[in-house]
């Protein structure tokens, strides 16, 4: 029986193949790179993806180097839970929101500002970037009121002043924002980070709002990923129960942003280079939600 033939590329052929692949990738990416120049991108980093922060920050620095203006909003729920347990502070949630008394708020502030925010800024600097950490209290950026007395010091956003963030962007910095706000009487309030990202993206008239979480995006009942849908279609999926559980408040935050932001993306932040694949390839890597289509003429 004849032996099956094998084919092995020479080093020159492999190099030529690599060059062709590089050229193909570059041709595909160039229109997207050109489109995103000088555009603001608000990126929300969920607490469940913080262990992948180095890769995410590297991609964010690439976005800035390519001419985009990234703004990072972060959560920190897992770290907050860890410290509350260490300090023997009881905690519980209602409708997905942490009930926050004064003691809990002290821990929330300590973790968000002293650990997560400061850690992201330090890592960005170590990677060669320039980031500045702040929260919604700085410059009275996020004005809020108590959302529900039963939730304690949990804020509902009333207004966002993007001036401080815009100033940092103009100076070449990457703003890193912790989800805290301030009430009319000066009290600090704990605010859901998805909502902070959505309202800040709207105030900045960002080109895109991107949620990095621990899911690939919105999936059909058979588990297949939906790469794109508009807000009307997303609302229908909520009503049908296809979008359920913790994805509902995230998609609701998307709806909050779509009045001022053309596109909102939900990506799995644990996947390598998911930001670059979503923004610079035709195939994408997650789910994009767009504004509902206008009625036909």
Where is each model-derived feature located?
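C-terminal/domain-terminus segments
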Residues: 276-281
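Charged catalytic cores and adjacent phosphate/nucleic-acid-binding surfaces used
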Residues: 285-287
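Nucleotide/pyrophosphate-binding catalytic subdomain
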Residues: 1-270, 283, 292-297
């Amino acid at each position: 029986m004849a032996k099956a033939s094998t084919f092995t590329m020479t080093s020159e052929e492999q190099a030529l193949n690599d060059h062709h692949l590089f050229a193909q990738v570059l041709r595909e990416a160039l229109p997207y790179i050109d489109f995103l120049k000088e555009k603001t991108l608000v990126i929300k980093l969920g607490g469940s993806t913080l262990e992948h922060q180095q890769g995410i920050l590297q991609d964010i620095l690439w976005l800035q180097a390519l001419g985009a203006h990234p703004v990072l909003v972060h959560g920190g729920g897992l770290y907050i839970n860890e410290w509350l347990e260490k300090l023997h502070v009881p905690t519980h949630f209602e409708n997905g929101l942490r009930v926050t008394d004064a003691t809990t708020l002290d821990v929330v502030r300590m973790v968000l500002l002293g650990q997560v925010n400061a850690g992201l800024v330090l890592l960005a600097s170590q990677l060669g970037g320039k980031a500045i950490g702040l929260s919604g209290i700085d410059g009275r950026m996020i004005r809020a009121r108590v959302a529900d007395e039963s939730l304690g010091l949990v804020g509902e956003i009333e207004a966002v002043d993007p001036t401080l963030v815009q100033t940092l962007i103009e100076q070449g910095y990457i703003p890193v924002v912790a989800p805290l706000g301030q009430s009319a009487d000066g009290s600090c309030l704990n605010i859901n980070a998805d909502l902070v990202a959505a309202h800040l993206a709207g105030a900045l008239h960002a080109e895109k709002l991107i949620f990095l979480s621990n899911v690939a995006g919105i999936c059909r009942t058979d588990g297949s990923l939906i790469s794109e849908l508009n807000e009307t279609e997303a609302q229908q999926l909520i009503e049908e129960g296809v979008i359920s559980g913790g994805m509902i408040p995230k998609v609701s935050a998307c709806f909050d942003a779509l009045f001022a932001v053309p596109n909102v993306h939900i990506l799995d932040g644990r996947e390598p280079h998911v930001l670059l694949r979503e923004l610079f390839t035709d195939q994408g890597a997650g789910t994009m939600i767009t504004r509902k289509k206008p009625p036909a003429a």
